[in-house]
Amino acid sequence: MFKILVAEKIADTGMEILKKNADIDVKIGLSHDELLETIGDYDALIVRSATKVNKELLENGKNLKVVGRAGNGVDNIDLDTATKKGIIVVNTPESNNVSTAEHAIALLLSVCRNIPQAYHSTVHGKWQRSHYKGVELFGKTITILGLGRIGSIVAERLKAFGMKVMAYDPYISDERVAKLGIKKVNSIEEVMKLSDFITIHLPKSEETIGIIGEKELSMAKRNLRIVNCARGGLVDEKALCKALEEGWIAGAALDVFVNEPKEGAKGGNFESPLLKYENVVVTPHLGASTVEAQNNVGTAIANQVLAALEGNIVDAVNLPSLNIKDTDYIAPYIRLSETLGKLYYSSQKDAIDSVEITYSGDISREQTKLLILSFLKGLLEPVVKERVNFVNVELLARNRGIKVTESIKNQVDYYSNLISAKIISKGKEITFAGTIFGKEEPRIVDFAGYEIDLAPTEYMLAIEHINQPGVIGQIGTILGKYNVNIETMRVSKNRKGENSIMILSIDQTIQKETADEIKKVPGVLTAKQIKL
């Protein structure tokens, strides 16, 4: 029987499942040193956010096969070390969707009707009906930033209020938006000018941090109220203070902040300049804090940990658990498929309507399900809020209106095995393809319609340009000027011979000023930075 250590409290529903299927020890409140001494006896460890599962702890876990995080975030777990040691890390990203969506709506109603402020006034003996006059939701326009699972639930609920619901999400197809019966907005500027309310449900990334800043707030309707139940920092807090101070917007309701006290901290130690504004409603990151969500989390983490221990494909944060016999053969193709998916959103930005994956050669006779899941994981991971993994990636694609098909071609002309992806976006066809050379050497042989022989690396630049002399030399000069080293370069003409693409493997990401200078080179059509 597997031995599992439960180091932090989970719901009774989860504990019951664990006790029926494994040997369970519950040791809550152990110090890090105590954990180091005892972890070697266990096959699995279950934690929440307080326990630091660092390199030292993982290396002491001689028998450790699975770490379960009862919740979404995994910042307290050293994923790199876990992956290197073959320890599966699982979490429960889908368990609190409804709770978070409902909390966003609760905050929306609170900021509209001044409920916390009126409560505070009334319990202190005041009766100020006219002072706390609110506004209705009915007939007003609300924009949802981020139409993933939580955003979609919010959209469904808000339609019942009789609101005009819009959505901003560049990575959601028009078909998906239409199915929800709402309107798609194509720019943040349009969002700010049209919205009476905004509710944010985006992932936190370089692209979304500060997505609403001073510039955007200055464009807003003066009656705008903003709700953020997603991640701290998506709304620039300094700019939000200025907007409230200057009367650019009517209010805000926030459940998340850039700097939050550690979980379990007592009241009185949270500070923010936003707390001084009467038209701001705040809560201490309560989005997932419901009985139902915690029961869901407990049940989900118990099932995930047990499934992982039994060798099944699970909701793995770091690596998929592959329950197949010949992992040595198919593993390079799994990584290749994920790379092909990553290349699309690194080089293109449009929403996807459909994806067709074709397998050619011997690989077509393998378990191709793992290959399509890997491709979709690479495709969606950079742009969705939810944790993307083998378990949920098909659902995430379906929720975004992406039609996915597979086909098999038993023979291939030039390669013993080939994985080809055809992506349709706004009626336009974009293709990528790759193969494996030797035992495990991946090669991209089709990059957005250009035939090429490219060994993918962590940092790359894809520069499409007119086929004319001097372009390559100028690009090299600019990169040298900014101390960026070119490790390899591949150049290919398109089939008509009019344009070319150069793909450079470089030793670092480039700064915005470098990219801007490259884009100004005569003949350069596009310049995309790719990080794999």
Q: How should each PLM-predicted stretch be described?
A:
Residues 150:
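Hydrophobic/small residue at the entry helix of a nucleotide-binding pocket
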Residues 51-58, 172-271, 289:
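Rossmann-like adenosine-cofactor binding region
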Residues 85, 93-141, 145, 153-161:
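Phosphate-binding beta-alpha-beta segment of Rossmann-like dinucleotide-binding domains, i.e.
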Residues 101-120, 140, 159-163, 243, ...:
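Oxidoreductase and adenylate-handling cofactor-binding alpha/beta cores
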Residues 89-90, 223, 229-348, 368, ...:
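Rossmann-like dinucleotide-binding domain for NAD(H)/NADP(H)
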Residues 8, 44-119:
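Phosphate/diphosphate ligand-binding glycine-rich loop within oxidoreductases
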Residues 1-42:
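N-terminal glycine-/charge-rich "phosphate-binding" loop or analogous flexible N-terminal tail
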Residues 321-532:
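A conserved regulatory-domain signal marking ACT and ACT-like small-molecule sensing domains
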